[in-house]
């Protein structure tokens, strides 16, 4: 049995959870999330907690046990607190700005790269070089942050590019010429 899956998930005061078989709907102050969990687990609400249990001792059920518990816990935390990822743009002339729901990134290409925010995601820019991606769905926030980073990943020689806040870039020495 999964050590992560065994622990029950407490439901905060302002969050309501409704279960319909494997379909889980979580409503909170930040929004609403719906997800259908894979087969192999059962989800029950006991008092003010959610309990996820495997349906059998098959390998697939045991594998999905901890996954499903974490997915539901992330949904509850997302609608109550929300998630955010911060990115930094490093390099001369590289900057970002928000126009409505669109993030416009100038990252050294001949044209600015535009990214439309999906539903439930917001972009914020500070000082033209710090981008914050925030929303209620942890998976969607992480995917959008990864897409922004993929526009211009940091290079190892000068460290220019788009990186996560706090990310260490492994630097390389340039080539040393013949002497």
From Swiss-Prot:
Q: Name one GO molecular function term.
A: structural constituent of ribosome
Gene that codes for this? rplF
Q: What does this protein do?
A: This protein binds to the 23S rRNA, and is important in its secondary structure. It is located near the subunit interface in the base of the L7/L12 stalk, and near the tRNA binding site of the peptidyltransferase center.
The protein depicted here goes by the name Large ribosomal subunit protein uL6
**What Pfam families does the record tag this protein with?**
Ribosomal_L6
Keywords, A to Z, come to:
Ribonucleoprotein, Ribosomal protein, RNA-binding, rRNA-binding
Quaternary structure (record)? Part of the 50S ribosomal subunit.
Origin: domain of life: Bacteria
